């Protein structure tokens, strides 16, 4: 079946970071043996930044890292990285704190924004890379995006001074927001917090148990998070919080309830990912007027992570039918969808929405399109091929794109 949808807005991406990564090697689509052969053939005289590493496909032992050329290998989830032994001296000269703390997973999960800044600095970002990345999204069905963690002030300046500014909404970490002048603060939609890790790095704040290694990791103690919300509630801006596991979701809701009761005010409040939200938490979020910003493409975690998640967690992932049918969240109003760039485009998200691992994860195409919303600053149409036999959706074409005046 072929159908046409509008060019869409991705409500959760990391545009400047992925633009910087465009000059880096990407092994996300490589078979493990091919990826390892590629890594072994990289230059010995400089540090190679490699993205798209999937630890469940290509585990990295200390012996393997000791034999590789100078590389930093960044997890596909963006949470977690490893550095080869020969790469450590290169990292020490450029980002010494990241180098010294590289093996401390708790520190890494608590410092995602500065690590993103380090990645951006290592890979390099300029207007050309930014434009090329955003243009590459058009044939994939995406015309605009929320940039969910602008890594540096310099990156904000590159984005906001580009012709693509009207197609981007900016979110920044609290520490970066406080460094900004009034003019730059006026450019951003709000502050973005990270409350837990990720399934890909075995650090999402789920109660568990995990299969094999895994630990619920929190960025903030409860009192520290509440203090941040109290302070941020006077900024007059929006609030977004990454919370994957049910324990992180609970921490977020409890802190927001107290902060709002005490007078904190935000233009909007978003919880990102919320893959393991339960019905009671969903009702509390609804009562607070919170927007759930979710990733239909993460439905495939229920297939990809059978090595670390129990059957109950595989099934609980992305409970869209409960959220929509039981609690009353409405795609496009208080439920938004985005890709997190994992992968880019609408095809994979549509595949997971229409052909999920569990019926509780299913979204209709109308719900998916509403949750993404139409592109900002640009318009066009996207032709989708929906193959019910192969259970796959692909983009077969896009119309001529028209830029907004």
Feature names for model-found ranges:
Residues 69, 164-166, 184-186, 265-267, ...:
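A short helix-to-beta-strand connector/capping loop
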Residues 158-192, 277-287:
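Extended hydrophobic/aromatic segments used for targeting, binding, or gating
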């Amino acid at each position: 079946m072929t159908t046409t949808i509008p060019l869409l807005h991705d409500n959760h991406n990391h545009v400047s970071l992925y633009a910087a990564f465009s000059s880096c090697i990407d092994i996300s689509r490589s078979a493990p043996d091919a990826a390892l052969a590629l890594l072994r053939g990289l230059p010995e005289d400089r540090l190679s930044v490699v993205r798209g590493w999937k630890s469940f496909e290509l585990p990295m032992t200390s012996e393997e890292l000791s034999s590789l050329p100078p590389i930093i290998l960044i997890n596909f989830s963006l949470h977690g990285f490893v550095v080869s032994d020969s790469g450590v001296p290169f990292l020490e000269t450029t980002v010494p704190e990241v180098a010294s703390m590289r093996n401390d997973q708790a520190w890494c999960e608590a410092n995602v924004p500065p690590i993103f800044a380090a990645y951006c600095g290592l890979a390099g970002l300029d207007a050309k890379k930014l434009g090329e990345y955003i243009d590459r999204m058009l044939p994939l069905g995406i015309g605009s995006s929320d940039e969910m963690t602008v890594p540096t002030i310099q990156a904000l300046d590159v984005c906001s001074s580009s012709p693509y500014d009207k197609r981007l909404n900016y979110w920044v970490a609290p520490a970066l927001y406080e460094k900004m002048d009034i003019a730059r603060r006026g450019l951003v939609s709000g502050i973005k917090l990270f409350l837990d890790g990720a399934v890909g790095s075995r650090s999402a704040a789920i109660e568990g148990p995990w299969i094999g290694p895994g630990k619920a990791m929190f960025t903030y103690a409860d009192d520290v998070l509440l203090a941040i919300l109290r302070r941020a509630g006077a900024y007059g801006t929006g609030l977004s919080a990454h919370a994957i596991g049910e324990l992180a979701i609970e921490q977020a809701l409890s802190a927001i309830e107290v902060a709002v009761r005490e007078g904190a005010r935000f233009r909007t409040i978003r919880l990102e990912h919320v893959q393991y939200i339960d019905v009671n938490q969903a009702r509390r979020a609804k009562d607070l007027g919170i927007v759930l910003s979710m990733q239909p493409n993460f439905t495939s975690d229920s297939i990809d992570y059978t090595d670390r998640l129990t059957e109950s967690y595989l099934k609980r992932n992305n409970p869209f039918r409960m959220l929509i049918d039981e609690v009353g969240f409405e795609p496009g109003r208080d439920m938004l969808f985005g890709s997190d760039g994992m992968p880019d485009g609408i095809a994979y998200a549509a595949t997971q929405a229409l052909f999920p691992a569990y019926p509780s994860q299913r979204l209709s195409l109308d719900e998916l399109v509403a949750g993404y919303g139409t592109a900002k600053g640009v318009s066009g149409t996207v032709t989708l091929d929906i193959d019910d036999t192969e259970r796959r959706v692909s983009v077969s074409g896009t119309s001529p794109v028209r830029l907004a005046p």
